[in-house]
Curated annotation (Swiss-Prot):
It comes from Syntrophotalea carbinolica (strain DSM 2380 / NBRC 103641 / GraBd1) (Pelobacter carbinolicus). This is Octanoyltransferase. One of its GO terms (biological process) is protein modification process. Gene3D superfamilies: Bira Bifunctional Protein, Domain 2. The active site is at C164. Its EC number is 2.3.1.181. PROSITE patterns: BPL_LPL_CATALYTIC, LIPB.
Amino acid sequence: MEIKDLGVMPYAEAYALQEQLVRDIAAGSAPETLLLVEHPPVYTLGRSGHMENLLDDSIEVVSINRGGDITYHAPGQLVGYPLLNLGLRGRDLRHYLRFLEEVLIAAAADTGVEGFRREGKTGVWTEQGKLASIGAGARRWVTMHGFALNVCLDLSGFSRIHPCGIVGCTMTSLQQITGQPVSMAQVKARVVYHFQSLLKTWLPLAQVATL
């Protein structure tokens, strides 16, 4: 597993990198990879998205092939693109989504924030609102897209949409909940730690067969 921190990168550039790595991983010429990035302000619209959930078109909108509806990205939000070969991990996309939720719930707990799942919804929620959005896709059973964890971003961009297509959805962040500055670098480190730790419990099929 390779971890790549891309810093702040335009969405289109990060998407092109995902596509190239997905092809390489599917061909067996690159290792599974976790990309970490922050994006300049942009809205992304998933496969089940509806433009009526966009209330203001003053910011760039990109239509993409992940699941889910519309969401917002901006600096101060940690975006993760895990590129995993589910062909070696049971081809279970639902399990993969629950895995991502567990990673983010654990990372939030390290900052003193209690996150949880909501039945019938994908993502991480808190009593104060939705903390993280998750939307995934796969090509040749290699995952792309991933999660967006609100760390310390300006949340006003969410007021111009119905986040994830949910009317009245309140978005929050680790910084808003804790009421104090939250270090992006520290959150990043905790996400990586929990991602790698939990991934070790999700053995590829080839390894399971040898147990």
